[in-house]
Amino acid sequence: MIWLTLVFASLLSVAGQLCQKQATCFVAINKRRKHIVLWLGLALACLGLAMVLWLLVLQNVPVGIAYPMLNLNFVWVTLAAVKLWHEPVSPRHWCGVAFIIGGIVILGSTV
């Protein structure tokens, strides 16, 4: 159950980061303030909840194991950037993502 909490904390952290990115997207000048407040508010909510869940994880998992698992954020953000904003990702970047996943598997299997 705690590993599910860790994944959820990671996803909420990523959601907060993606909301920050969305806040920077261009909108009409008369809607800009509302747009920024909405997305930054959502970012704060996601990041705040992620922090609470992260504290629960740290109560149950050694920090040396739990912290590297947050590298999942790099994977989630890359996937979201491609899907949501159609950002290009180089083969070298995908190779790095594969190494991150490999590292997470290796570190996670030591528990």
Curated annotation (Swiss-Prot):
Pfam families: EamA (PF00892). This is Probable 4-amino-4-deoxy-L-arabinose-phosphoundecaprenol flippase subunit ArnE. GO terms for cellular component: plasma membrane. The chain crosses the membrane at residues 36-56, 61-81, 88-108. The lineage of its organism: Bacteria, Pseudomonadati, Pseudomonadota, Gammaproteobacteria, Enterobacterales. Translocates 4-amino-4-deoxy-L-arabinose-phosphoundecaprenol (alpha-L-Ara4N-phosphoundecaprenol) from the cytoplasmic to the periplasmic side of the inner membrane. Pathway: Bacterial outer membrane biogenesis; lipopolysaccharide biosynthesis. GO terms for molecular function: carbohydrate derivative transmembrane transporter activity. It comes from Shigella dysenteriae serotype 1 (strain Sd197). Heterodimer of ArnE and ArnF. Its main location: membrane. It is found in: Cell inner membrane. The keyword Membrane applies. Belongs to the ArnE family. The keyword Cell inner membrane applies. It is a multi-pass membrane protein. GO terms for biological process: lipid A biosynthetic process; lipopolysaccharide biosynthetic process.
